Amino acid sequence: MIYFIKAGNKHVKIGYSANPEKRLKELQTGNPLKLKLVTTLLGSYETEKALHLYFARNKREGEWFHLTGELENCLKASIWPKRKNVEPTTIKQFLENGIHFHLSQKAKRSKKVKNLIRQYSVETK
């Protein structure tokens, strides 16, 4: 499961964990800022890496990213279902629009990212 954990008003962690609530508790230990689990969505390790690629220009340290307007709007406006076997339409569109831009620059060698794009691509008619 993909999780988004906010630290204050400036940073967000994009990560992958089978148990995001447990991961939040682990990260909170020793952290002076109050962390908040903003949302989760169904996804794989490859989905996490695709999101990291998309927001690479805002990367701070590790899996922490500067909370830009774009990322904040994505977190506020997107409806990402938490139920099993439900495809999140918003994340499909997000990945389709974002990854194609970065694929030519950062991920040409990655078969996993290419497969992810094929998996989430949506034909519009």
Label every PLM stretch briefly.
Residues M1-K125:
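Non-catalytic accessory segments flanking enzymatic or RNA/DNA-binding domains
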